[in-house]
Amino acid sequence: MTWRDEIARRVRGEHLRDAPLAPRTAVRVGGPADLLCRPADGDALSALLGAVRELGVPLSVLGGGANTLVADAGVRGVVLRLPQDFPGESTDGDTLVLSAGAPIARLPARAHAHGLVGMEFLGGIPGTLGGAAAMNAGTRLGEMKDVVTRLELATADGAGFVPAAALGYAYRTCRLPPGAVVARVEVRLRPGDVAASEALMREDRERRRATQPLDRPTFGSTFTNPPGEYAGRLIEAVGLKGHRVGGAVWSPVHANFVTNLGGATARDVLALIRLARARVKERFGIALETEVRLMGEFPPDELAGLDGHAADGGGPGAASGGARPREAT
C-alpha cells in the first residue's frame, strides 16, 4: 500500500491524485500535487495531519490560490484544501465563526444579512478566509487583525481556539504555531448601516477596476509596501512597468502586479520578481519583500536573490526551503 492509499484509507473526504494546481491558483501557474486532499470535517482534518506526520509525508496548505506561486515541477506530498462548506459555522450576536475554506468574496454579504458591518475591506480580496487570516490580508479600508478575535487551529492532536492577541498580528503576517492549520476564524463585527457599507464596497470595487489589472490572472500585489513607500512606484521608477519575461509581465496598469499573459511559468514569474528586487535595491537601497507564498520544488537558481521569501511545500516543521507549512490565500 502506498502512502497515498494509506491516507485515502484513513482520512474521510476527497482525494485527488496528480491534481493540477495551476487552475486552482489566481495566477494560473504551476505543476500538479501528488495528492490533493479535502477532509470532510474537523476530525478528518486532524486525522490527515496525524497521518502525514506518522508517514513522513510533506504537507502544504492551499486556500483560494491567491498570493500563491506553485513550482513548475509541482508539489510533492499532500496539498490540503479545506472545503468551502467545512462544518462548524455559527453566528452569535456580533460574533461570527466562519470556515477557513469560505471564499472571502461572500463574507461581507453574510455579515450584512445579520445587520453587521466591518468587513468592507474584504470586498476586493480574492482567496479564502483562512489564508486571509493567516497573512493578515487587507486593503486601504482595513485588515484582518481589525476583526479577528480567535483562530481555531488544527494539529495532529486535535483543534482549539487561540486568541488573536497571542498570534503576533502585524503588517501582512501573523505567527501560527508550527504544524498548525487554520480551520475556522472567529470575527467580531458591529451593527451598522448596511446600505452605506455596500456603497463603500461598490466604490472600492470601481477604484480597483480602474487601477488594477483585474482582467488577467494575477496574484494581486506581489510585494508588500515598504514603510512610507509604494512598491509599485519603486518598480515603475526603475523602468520595469510593462516589462515581460516569457508569458509573465509587470502589469502596465499597476507595476506591483505580475500578470499571466498566457502560458507563463513559475520560472518566468520569479525572473520578474528577482529583477525588480535587484533594481530597486541597487537604486533605492530598499529590499522589497514578497507577499507571494512559494509552494513546491523550485530549482535553486530560481530562488537566488529571494532571501526572506515565504516558502510552502514541505511538511509539518519541514516545508520546502526549511519553512513550516503555511496557509496560502
Swiss-Prot record:
Localisation per UniProt entry: Cytoplasm
Cofactor(s) required, per the database record: FAD
Coiled-coil region: none
Major location category of this protein: cytoplasm
Gly residues: compositionally biased ranges: 311-320
Class of enzymatic activity (EC top level): oxidoreductase
Pathway: Cell wall biogenesis; peptidoglycan biosynthesis
Gene Ontology annotations for the cellular component aspect, listed alphabetically: cytosol
Enzyme Commission numbers on file: 1.3.1.98
UniProt keyword terms in alphabetical order: Cell cycle, Cell division, Cell shape, Cell wall biogenesis/degradation, Cytoplasm, FAD, Flavoprotein, NADP, Oxidoreductase, Peptidoglycan synthesis
GO molecular function, one term: FAD binding
Catalytic activity: UDP-N-acetyl-alpha-D-muramate + NADP(+) = UDP-N-acetyl-3-O-(1-carboxyvinyl)-alpha-D-glucosamine + NADPH + H(+)
Keyword Cell cycle among record annotations: yes
Domain FAD-binding PCMH-type span(s) in chain numbering: 28-192
Region feature Disordered, mapped onto this chain: 204-225, 303-329
Family of the protein in this entry: Belongs to the MurB family.
Task of the protein: Cell wall formation.
Protein name in UniProt: UDP-N-acetylenolpyruvoylglucosamine reductase
Provenance organism: Anaeromyxobacter dehalogenans (strain 2CP-C)
